[in-house]
Curated annotation (Swiss-Prot):
InterPro entries: piRNA_biogenesis_EXD1 (IPR052144), RNaseH-like_sf (IPR012337), RNaseH_sf (IPR036397)
Protein name: Protein Exd1 homolog
GO CC term, one of those recorded: P granule
Organism domain of life: Eukaryota
């Protein structure tokens, strides 16, 4: 998420040591190499089908949708997918919609999808693309359970906290990067999206403590992603304010159990 979504910055309090993984020089160099492998897809051609093949071959992918902060209330502009081989930016505005083959991948249990704020993204995909997102690992849920907090950190804020990176380095500090509905997309916008989705992927790797914890996050993420299901659009709008904690109550019932599991790891 980003400031174009209207989200105000929350105090970036220190996270517990067990979920802080400061980025070093080597990690930043690897990230820079990953940012050289960005593929923009705006039509159904060989590049599109090659991207789908790579995505289907993965066990885990990282996913962004822009704009999605207000769920169903904005049309889909961009879908970004990161694999171990690179980043694919699907220009949904140019394509017209998310076509069936890609939709089936998003709905399937495999590959697993690493996303942030699954309740907002799932609501968006359901109402804008008629896609019921499956196989979800929500990094927001993972951070909440790991740190025993309920602060609505955006993806850039969570990345900044977990990896010890200044917010300016995560966001780039350029307002034009946050307008993903205008065309053409700039080179800096594409690098910004690729950086977020790749760092989200890496964050999953670090927050994936054990099979037990991972399974719990998957289970809670799926339930959390359904937070807005069945609500009228007017009710959803009220509960999608930037500081909204709607749906967070689902995390509370699992908190004590998750804490006990973490103590045993």
């Amino acid at each position: 998420m980003n400031k174009s979504d209207g989200n105000e910055s929350f105090a970036l309090d220190s996270l517990p040591e067990n979920i802080r993984y400061p980025f070093g020089k080597r990690e930043l160099e690897i990230l820079e190499k990953q940012l050289d492998r960005i593929v923009l897809i705006y039509q159904v051609d060989t590049t599109y089908h090659s991207a789908l093949k790579d995505i289907k071959d993965q066990k885990i992918i990282s996913l962004l949708v822009e704009p999605s902060f207000y769920g169903r209330h904005h049309p889909t502009s961009i879908l970004v997918v990161a694999t171990c081989n690179g980043t694919y930016i699907f220009d949904i505005k140019a394509l017209g919609l998310i076509f069936l083959e890609l939709a089936k991948i998003l709905e399937a249990d495999q590959p697993r999808k690493v996303i942030h704020y699954s309740h907002r993204i799932a609501d968006h995909l359901l109402h804008r693309q008629r896609i019921s997102l499956g196989g979800i690992f929500d990094t927001f849920v993972a951070v909440c359970l790991s740190s025993n907090t309920r602060i609505p950190y955006t993806l850039p804020e969570a990345i900044s906290l977990v990896f010890g990176l200044p917010m300016e380095k995560v966001t780039g500090g350029c307002e034009s990067q946050r307008n993903f509905t205008a065309r053409p997309l700039t080179h800096s916008q594409m690098r910004y999206l690729a950086k977020l989705v790749q760092l989200q992927h890496i964050m999953h790797d670090h927050l994936n403590y054990s099979h037990i914890f991972c399974a719990e996050v998957y289970r809670i993420s799926l339930e959390f992603s359904h937070s807005y299901y069945g609500l009228r659009s007017c009710d959803v709008a009220i509960n999608m304010a930037p500081a909204s904690s709607f749906g967070f109550q689902l995390l509370d019932s699992f908190c004590k159990k998750a804490d006990k599991e973490l103590e045993q790891i």
